[in-house]
Amino acid sequence: MTDVSAAASRPAVPPSVIDPDAPAKVAARNLNFYYGQHQALKNINLSIAANRVTAFIGPSGCGKSTLLRVFNRMYDLYPGQRVEGQVLLDNTDILDPRLDLNLLRARVGMVFQKPTPFPMTIYENIAFGIRLYEKLSKSEMDDRVEKALQGGALWNEVKDKLNASGLSLSGGQQQRLCIARTVALRPEVILFDEPCSALDPISTAKIEGLIDELKEHYTIAIVTHNMQQAARVSDTTAFMYLGEMVEFGPTNKVFTSPADRRTQDYITGRFG
């Protein structure tokens, strides 16, 4: 299926999800971000509705992964970076320096490009994060681990080997373990940064199917270089170029009748 036909087959998304004044789960307002003197994000404004999948597309270096990292303040881990504007999570500005970052990152989970299982058992990969926030009995923890692995579409494959190392799993299974680890903390938003770029087509299809299931319970933002993937999994799509938000709207509209020539040129492969 082509990018355009995949996008066209998706149900239309109400225009309200891109109304900057509409209620949003996550919203950026006049957002600017700097790596030292380099401005990586330029006056970003967008609203992401709850229980939708929003894809961020654009050429390498356009700022899409940077934007994702601003959503849970990963940039705080590195010196010399600066942010201006607002990022709202349920109308609370997460850029407030008084905010508890551990609690923020529990609410806004992240799955990275390369699977990053901990060097411990499958069970402990899930339980470790839960223990940082909650004190559960053994039976309660067992239940949470099972539910998390079910949420990551992995339970049936690992239920008989929970004491095996997470590193013993295949690449696709490791990525689903990372998703389960994120789900275990009961976040409200899940950020995916190129989650399938290191996976084979079969594993990619499983992750995409899982994302479609997860949006029933979570708000999802995904960065991808794969146009077909963006068209398949997302409800709304944002095209970014040179740190700017060029276009943001329902995926079927962005792919079939983009409003900006740069969007059309990128989607049709004229650059990028």
Swiss-Prot record:
| Chief location of this protein within or outside the cell | membrane
Q: Which cysteine-cysteine pairs are annotated as disulfide bonds in the entry? A: none
Q: Tell me, what is an example of a GO biological process annotation in this record?
A: phosphate ion transmembrane transport
ABC transporter domain location is: 26-267
Q: Known catalysed reaction(s)? A: phosphate(out) + ATP + H2O = ADP + 2 phosphate(in) + H(+)
E.C. code? 7.3.2.1
* UniProt entry keywords in alphabetical sequence: ATP-binding, Cell inner membrane, Cell membrane, Membrane, Nucleotide-binding, Phosphate transport, Translocase, Transport
Q: How does it sit in the membrane?
A: Peripheral membrane protein
Where is this gene product found? Cell inner membrane
The record, for Pfam families, names: ABC_tran (PF00005)
Gene Ontology annotations for the cellular component aspect, listed alphabetically: plasma membrane
Asked whether the UniProt record includes Membrane among its keywords, one would answer yes
Annotated GO molecular function terms are: ATP binding; ATP hydrolysis activity; ATPase-coupled phosphate ion transmembrane transporter activity
Outline the subunit composition. Answer: The complex is composed of two ATP-binding proteins (PstB), two transmembrane proteins (PstC and PstA) and a solute-binding protein (PstS).
Question: Per its database record, what is this protein's job?
Answer: Part of the ABC transporter complex PstSACB involved in phosphate import. Responsible for energy coupling to the transport system.
Q: This protein is called what? A: Phosphate import ATP-binding protein PstB
Q: Which organism is it from?
A: Nitrobacter hamburgensis (strain DSM 10229 / NCIMB 13809 / X14)
